[in-house]
């Protein structure tokens, strides 16, 4: 079983992911979605957490061997990033969604040197907007952002476009395609549900029609 499949299985087992193709969720953006993901739940399950953190470490070593500092996005990327940095014996920092409105007005908390090679940790990629904003902030403060590594992606076309336009490499440990395949195999969804979930990936607006 691949890492992506193992993580997808764990996310379903611990109910970090809910699939309701016949009774969709409403995202903050207003999009009706057959999937809801809360990867913060993974922190409460040592087996799942260990699988994910070890997956992060191996992925970073394989794709970004020159990394010098790990950064987590506030707030979801912070605990994962701190664990990864500890496992890799690397410095850690975190990136706020916006600068503090008091004190030194920092957007990056922790010490990042000019030109230091950074990998940013995120828990979930939908469109990628927030983590790309974090990457831009890190670059403005002098970091050399090598890429983003995340637990899971919905594989939305908008995310691919956004990362391509930003020139930022994205690697994820698991993904939507893998998850719905595992969900069908393990009986979480019906054939009709799988069909709707596949349609959502292709067209987030008209998938119910």
UniProtKB/Swiss-Prot annotation:
Residues annotated to bind orotate: 126
UniProt KW keywords: Glycosyltransferase, Magnesium, Pyrimidine biosynthesis, Transferase
PROSITE patterns according to UniProt: PUR_PYR_PR_TRANSFER
Entry-linked SUPFAM superfamilies: PRTase-like
Binding-site list for 5-phospho-alpha-D-ribose 1-diphosphate: 96, 100, 102, 122-130
A GO BP annotation: 'de novo' UMP biosynthetic process
EC number from the UniProt entry: 2.4.2.10
Cofactor section: Mg(2+)
A molecular-function term among this protein's GO annotations: magnesium ion binding
Superkingdom, taxonomy of origin: Bacteria
Pathway named in the protein's UniProt entry: Pyrimidine metabolism; UMP biosynthesis via de novo pathway; UMP from orotate: step 1/2
Family matches, as InterPro entries: OPRT (IPR023031), Or_phspho_trans_dom (IPR004467), PRibTrfase_dom (IPR000836), PRTase-like (IPR029057)
Protein family (similarity comment): Belongs to the purine/pyrimidine phosphoribosyltransferase family. PyrE subfamily.
Subunit structure: Homodimer.
Protein role: Catalyzes the transfer of a ribosyl phosphate group from 5-phosphoribose 1-diphosphate to orotate, leading to the formation of orotidine monophosphate (OMP).
Name of the protein this chain belongs to: Orotate phosphoribosyltransferase
Organism per entry: Streptococcus pyogenes serotype M1
Lineage per the UniProt record: Bacteria, Bacillati, Bacillota, Bacilli, Lactobacillales
């Amino acid at each position: 079983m691949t890492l992506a499949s193992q993580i997808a299985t764990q996310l379903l087992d611990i109910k970090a992911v809910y699939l309701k193709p016949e009774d969709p969720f409403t995202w903050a953006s207003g999009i009706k979605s057959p999937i809801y993901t809360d990867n913060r739940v993974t922190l409460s399950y040592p087996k799942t957490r260990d699988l994910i953190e070890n997956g992060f470490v191996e992925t970073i070593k394989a794709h970004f061997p020159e990394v010098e500092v790990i950064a987590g996005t506030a707030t979801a990327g912070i605990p994962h990033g701190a664990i990864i940095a500890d496992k890799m014996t690397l410095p850690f920092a975190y990136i706020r969604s916006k600068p503090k409105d008091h004190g030194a007005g920092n957007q990056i908390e922790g010490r990042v040197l000019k030109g230091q090679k950074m990998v940013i940790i995120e828990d979930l990629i939908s469109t990628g907007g927030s983590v790309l904003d974090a990457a831009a902030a890190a670059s403005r403060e002098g970091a050399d952002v090598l890429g983003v590594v995340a637990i899971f992606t919905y594989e939305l076309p908008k995310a691919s476009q956004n990362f391509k336009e930003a020139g930022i490499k994205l690697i994820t440990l698991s993904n939507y395609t893998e998850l719905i395949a595992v969900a069908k195999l393990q009986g979480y969804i019906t054939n009709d549900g799988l069909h709707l979930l596949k349609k959502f990936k292709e067209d987030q607006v008209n998938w119910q029609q």
